[in-house]
Amino acid sequence: LLKTRMKNGLANFISCILPASMILFAGACTKPSPDYIEVSWGDGELVFESIGGEREISVTALQNWLVSVSGDEDSAEWCRITPIAGLAGSAQLTLTVDSYEGEAERMCVLTFVCANQKKEVEVRQTGTDGDAYVYFSDLEFKKMILDEYDSDKDRKLSSEEALQVVRLEFHDTDISSLKGIEKMGNLEYLDCSYNKISGELNLHDLKKLRVAQLHHNLYSSLDVSGCSALDTLIANDNYSYNDAGYMEFPLEEVNLSACTSLTKADFTDNNLTSLDCSDCVSLTDLNCRYNRLSFLDISGCDRLVRLSCRTNAGLSGELDLSHCPDLEYLECYETAFEKLNTNGCSVLKYVYAHNSSLSEVDFSSNKALVHLDIYNNKIPALDVRNNIELTYLDASLNRIQEIDLSRDTELVELLLGYNSVSELDLSGHEKLVRLTANSNALTRIDVSGCTMLENLNVDGNQLTSL
């Protein structure tokens, strides 16, 4: 019975092993359990170009197995796999596909059989008219797209059908590759967050893409260069846990070249060491905190309103924001910046620049400033006479020797501990609630008229009276 169902190669194989293994093989193929068999070949589909080629296929089975090729009458000639049978255990097979001169795609099926288990694997080869269809690397992604956009129900996505895709949104799947998405040239909205997309994520062919929600995945590089319509890019929190339970952050490279319409970008919690936003001339909101940046180029980002580059220990030198007149919110703390230039930022309201290496700051042109947090730096002098809207100032742990606060009567909280200030006049600051000026060199302090003061700490000074 076996010989009548197999071709010559398989018959020869069986004639050699039949005397020794007839009982074992027959028993294995009739038992309903265990009948486990696993077939793998890496990522994606088994798709060959017209030039042909070879692919390695791995088989793991608990019993003896067979594989056959089916399809058109010539499929066994142009698509061959060796060996075609094996015993229980693991084996490496070689799939060979010949070159092809036809225009239309051709296909065959590999059928793996062991006991009651049967697995079919599709093998496809593109013709010379290979651009007629879209080829996917991820079978789950392919199925999702075909279920929605395969209008002629041929279980293939033509280039014309691909252009019907305008919006894609999917979460919590095992999809690991978006290969094939490059043919969806009319795609405007993509939300593939909370998936397992890995390797290189290339979206540079999507010229109409406006929104890309790509966060919580596993890709190592992101290319959106040339996406001139892209307005919103969210690519934060791409991480996984290794076997030891520690977090790993794979995203190391982002290409934003020619993203001239981009207004919002978020790269929080990744592994970036360099970020060039110089082409992003429309950018208003940039978040690149919690990376390993040592290079950040925002020289062309004149429209910035919010910037968070905090917790990047490699960022040093000068942070020059003098070309950002619309800047309102700045987080640059836990960096190694030595100079902060906010000249011309006339609407800047919130500055968080603590735990850094700042030794030079000038806030004289930031007249709208209401919150200034610069503690634990190396600042020797601080002029806030023009910052009359200030309600919160923390300049603790610096090297300040004198400070004039006579015009800053809106202050509610003032923290100046661990400096070298010798005199402090806060008379008439009726809104002041909290004052911390411990561990300075104070010999005189005036808090007369501070009728709202609730918390006062001037320990560790040289005061003889209060």
Where are these regions (language model features)?
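Bacterial Sec-dependent N-terminal signal peptides
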Residues: I23-V47, A115-F136
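Surface-exposed binding patches on compact interaction domains or structured appendages
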Residues: Y36, A61-T94
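A short beta-strand micro-motif common to beta-rich folds, especially ectodomain repeats
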Residues: L93, E103-N116
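LRR N-terminal entry segment and analogous cap-like coil->beta motifs
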Residues: K153-L201, D205-L206, R210
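Conserved hydrophobic beta-strand positions in leucine-rich repeat
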Residues: V166-L168, L190-C192, R210-L214, D231-A235, ...
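Consensus "Asn ladder" position of solenoid repeat domains
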Residues: T173, N195, N217, N238, ...
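Canonical leucine-rich repeat
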Residues: L178-I181, E200-L201, L222-V224, D243, ...
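Leucine-rich repeat
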Residues: M184-L187, D205-L209, C227-L230, E248, ...
